[in-house]
Every structure is written in C-alpha cells, then in structure tokens.
Design a protein with these regions (language model features):
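Short glycine/serine-rich loop segments
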Residues: 1-78, 276-288, 292-297
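Loop/turn elements at helix/coil->beta-strand transitions in domains of secreted/extracellular proteins
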Residues: 16-20, 70, 101-102, 131-134, ...
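Glycine-rich, small-residue loops and helix-cap segments
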Residues: 1, 201-347
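A short helix-breaking turn/cap at a secondary-structure junction
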Residues: 40-124, 131, 142-145, 189, ...
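Short helix-loop capping/hinge segments that flank enzyme active sites or metal/cofactor-binding pockets
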Residues: 98-105, 157-228, 283-293, 342-344
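Active-site-proximal beta-strand/loop segments in catalytic clefts of secreted hydrolases
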Residues: 22-26, 45, 81, 107-110, ...
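Short connector loops at secondary-structure junctions
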Residues: 133-151
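Sec-exported extracytoplasmic/periplasmic mature domains
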Residues: 14, 79-83, 126-133, 157, ...
C-alpha cells in the first residue's frame, strides 16, 4: 500500500519479494509505509546511516532505514548500514525481556479517534504491562509553538534547495539537470508527462528561498529543533521519568485518488516529532483492521537506536502480529472491501 516515498520498499518487504528493503525518510516515509504494509520499519537517529547517493530533501531530517519482516531483520540491516568508528552490534543488543521494569510513556494525545485502532492500541499496551512495564500516561502535546507548522515547512524548503543543488552538481556529466532551477525548467518543458497529475508548486517555493545563512531559515530551524528535542522528546522522557515513548504508528491507509487527492482519516501517531528531532523511531505490526495493517511505535532519545530496536523486538516476540501476504489484483478484491461494496456485512 502507498504511504510516503518508500511505499515500494514497504510493499516489497510485505509481499516477501525481499527479506528486507531500504526506505528513506524525511518525515514519515519509513514509518508510514511500514505501518500501512504491516512490516517493521526503523528510522535511525539522523546521521547514523550515510546519505551518500540518496536524493536529499532535508539535511536535518533525512535518513535511510530498514524495512523488514521482523525486528531481527532490521537489526541485521542496521549492522550493515550504520556508520562510525564505534559500531554497535544491533543484533546482539536485542533483548526479548527489554520491557521488564521499564517506564513507558503513553502519548495519549496522539491516539486519534479511530475506535478500531484505539482498541488494538489498548491490547498492545496490555502486552507491555504483562511484560513487566509500567505505563505512564502523557496527555498533553509538548509542541505548543503556534508557528510550528509554518516553521517546519520553511526549513524543508530552504534545505531542499540547498541540498538538491549540491546533489545535482555532484552527479555525472550525463545528468543534464544540475540544479533545482533546471529540474523545474525540465518539468515545464515536459509538462505532459512530468506535470500530468501533480504541479511543482513546492519546487517553485523552494527555488525562491535564499541560502542556509538566511536568518529566517536559522530562526525557523532552531525553533523546530528546540520544540521537538529539548521541549519535545527530551522533555517528555525527563519530566515523566520514562525510558521510551509509545503511540499508534498511524491510520489505516486510504484509497489513492490521483484526481481529487487521497483522503486521510483522522491521523493518529506522533512520528513527526521524532522525524523533525532526528531521533530513533520503530514501528512494529500490532494487528489489522478490515485486512489493513496498523503498527505500534516506540520512540526514544538521540542515539538510543539499539534500545529502541530492542523495545520493538520485545514487543514483537510477545505479539507476532505481522500478517502473511495475500495477493490480490486490486484493493477491491479484499474480502472486507468487496463485501462492503456489495452492501454486505462479512461474517
């Protein structure tokens, strides 16, 4: 199922076309397609995995991450993908008893209004209790900055132009578009193909920004990083004295509508905070709703990647909710959806 720029990786891992796949995330593109396709998705701390040869969007948020059928598979991929001189053995760090004695912060403000997702989430929380964890209720969203949405978007516009220009300039001479401006011009020249379904208004907005020395960019970047780090995840972990944060990973995936646009349901989850902070986040399948998968998220502090993987592993060993793939020609062939379209209720 599509959800974000790594949808192909999610579908490939879910359908067993590969034991694992690499996704790339700026804000949700590892977690969202993993949630939608019923696989494990791990978004590492930004900087832990090399971004070389990956088309960039944001220097503060971009990261590659594994999308696999199990947490063990994600840990194995991280052993190969992680960089740095003091490399961690992520497989050896997995502990199926990781939840015992831990204080877990439950992000109640991010649960959304879908009763089926919330029911699965409550069942998953009971699993944590049975595993020996203590739950701590967190009801207030720590991000209170009124300009947060605009600031975070501005940061992406500035960083997209700067990072893409550098990336395009370093490509082989056979690549004819050497900058964002030239990409925009190419799309206009080939509008019948490149702009048949979508415009490039975001490209245009990025192109008119200045450089990363602009005080407007610096102020916006510092504000959103502070809101998601010191006043966000770091504050929640410290003030509530918890080891890790949990939430539903996201909604069930909507149908794709290239004409009118996809219609997303009320969006549970808190992945944007971890994405913008650049902190680790894992989603593990917690069940299905009308044949559609949904995941359970663990989020931690900067560089707590091994711990976050291990929390996910402990949860997975107790639940094993990943659904084996079934193959249909289109979504309307799914039993629940087919019955609904016929006006019938499936037994």
């Amino acid at each position: 199922y599509p959800c974000g720029s790594s949808s192909g990786s999610g579908a490939g891992a879910a359908s067993s076309m590969a034991a694992g796949a690499v996704g790339t995330e700026t804000n949700g593109s590892v977690i969202c397609p993993s949630n939608a396709n019923g696989v494990v998705g791990f978004k590492p701390t930004v900087g832990l995995v090399s971004q070389q040869y990956i088309v960039p969007i944001s220097s503060t948020q971009d990261t590659a991450g594994p999308m696999t059928k199990s947490v063990m598979g994600a840990a194995m991929m991280m052993n190969a993908m992680a960089t740095g001189s003091a490399k961690t053995n992520y497989v050896a760090a997995l502990d199926q008893d990781m939840l015992r004695g831990k204080r877990v912060g439950v992000l109640r403000y991010s649960t959304g209004s879908n009763k089926d997702i919330n029911a699965l989430f409550e069942e998953s929380l009971n699993v944590l209790i049975q595993a020996g964890a203590e739950l701590v209720e967190i009801t207030e969203n720590p991000i209170q900055l009124s300009e947060f949405g605009q600031y975070s978007f501005d940061v992406l516009l500035y960083e997209f132009k700067a990072t893409l220009n550098a990336y395009q300039a370093a490509t082989p001479d056979t690549v004819k578009t050497r900058s964002l401006a030239e990409v925009i011009a190419f799309n206009i020249e080939n509008a019948g193909i490149e702009l048949a379904l979508f415009d490039q208004s975001i490209f245009d907005a990025a192109e008119i920004t200045s450089n990363l020395d602009d005080p407007r960019y610096i102020a916006a970047r510092d504000a959103v990083l502070k809101a998601t780090r010191e006043e966000g995840i770091d504050k929640l972990l410290a003030e509530h004295n918890v080891d890790v944060l949990v939430a539903p990973s996201g909604p069930t995936v909507p149908r794709v509508d290239p004409i009118n646009g996809d219609v997303w349901p009320p969006f549970p989850g808190s992945g944007s905070m971890a994405a913008i902070a650049g902190y680790p986040h894992i989603t593990v399948p917690m069940g299905t709703i009308h044949s559609l998968s949904v995941g359970f998220s663990f989020m931690g502090a900067k560089d707590d990647d091994a711990k976050v993987l291990s929390y996910g592993y402990a949860f997975e060993q107790l639940t094993n909710e990943r659904a084996e793939p079934q193959y249909y020609t289109n979504a309307e062939d799914l039993p629940d959806i087919a019955a609904a379209m016929r006006g019938q209720k499936r037994n």
